[in-house]
């Protein structure tokens, strides 16, 4: 069981590090490029694609959110891969993996492969946190005197 736990930590940490690096590989699109790209998907059957484009482009156009997300993915992925900081890395990654899963659940419901992939990442993250429940259960269940 311990080897599976280590493999899950390394897999999730590596995946987050890779995702964080990818946030910095492409240049930020100009606002006019986003508008031109969005205009291609105005048909009713392409509403999901339009929502995805506008959502991701909006995050990139803020000037900071996309970079902060990339830095957090890198940092928390590294924390997850280091033995002593694995629990805190998993805890900090929980909202990020939840967000990624919900993004794919609501904006890409037809892409089953990515939905399963992000669901597995979220489940691994939940599993890593649950495995360390002795560290946090006292915060939820207080014993009566």
Q: What are the residue ranges of the model-derived segments?
A:
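Generic transmembrane alpha-helix motif of multi-pass integral membrane proteins
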Residues: 74-81
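Short, solvent-exposed cationic patches
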Residues: 46-47, 107
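Residue-level signal for transmembrane alpha-helical positions in Major Facilitator Superfamily
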Residues: 12, 72-73
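Individual transmembrane alpha-helix segments
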Residues: 55-72
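Juxtamembrane membrane-water interface segments that cap and precede transmembrane helices
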Residues: 47-57
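Extended, low-polarity transmembrane helix blocks
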Residues: 1-41, 60, 67, 82-145
